A protein has these predicted regions:
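A short hydrophobic/aromatic micro-motif that marks alpha-helical segments and, especially, helix-coil
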Residues: 23-24, 138, 176
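Intrinsically disordered, low-complexity regions
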Residues: 43-45, 134, 185
Length: 185
């Protein structure tokens, strides 16, 4: 059975990420972000959202785990910042129902959502500059970089929350990530 580890960065929806994955029939374990990656045996990693980059613990170490990684909200920001991109305060903070335009239908993570989808956003900061190797795969009027991908390294991020019911095609994001994990297994 596929095993996905959700690294808990103290986000308000982390438990929903684990539930969404379990509902898709995979073994999903939520681990504290102080858990060393070498203590985890997984086919993929989800870096959860959270309130503050100063509280991500050892989560950045999971970027070297040699398995696909999906960053959600703060998790995406963590990927960008750790790999040389930039994160800054967004113009629109708080909660919002957002229409996201998907750039291409061939992206492994969000391509199936093209040309657009409605999502639930809950963030004050956002990725403002992509790290080398990443492409912008979705954007919106409130956040220029809503999703990013580096398929060669199997690193992906979404600024929105696919795990909440307000995100119309959130389950598809997790299904697509599981397909990436299965391809790499």
């Amino acid at each position: 059975m596929t095993c996905i580890v959700v690294v808990d960065n103290h986000g308000q929806f982390t438990h929903l990420e684990g539930r969404a994955l379990r509902d898709l029939g995979v073994d999903a374990d939520i681990v504290d972000n102080e858990t060393p990656p070498e203590e985890v045996d997984a086919d993929g990693v989800v870096l959860s959202g959270g309130p503050d980059m100063d509280r991500v613990g050892r989560a950045p170490e999971y970027l070297e785990a040699d398995v696909p990684v999906l960053g959600i909200c703060l998790g995406m920001q963590l990927i960008a910042e750790e790999l040389g991109g930039a994160v800054d305060s967004g113009d629109y903070g708080g909660y919002a129902d957002v229409t996201v335009e998907v750039e291409t239908d061939d992206d492994p993570l969000v391509g199936s959502l093209a040309p657009e989808t409605r999502v639930w956003a809950s963030h004050a900061d956002e990725v403002t500059e992509l790290p080398d190797g990443f492409v912008r795969t979705a954007g919106s009027d409130v956040c220029n970089i809503e999703a990013m991908s580096d398929p060669d390294r199997e690193l992906y991020g979404v600024q929105w929350h696919p795990e909440v019911a307000h995100t119309e095609e959130g389950e598809a994001v997790f299904e697509n990530f599981l397909a990436v994990c299965a391809d790499g297994a």
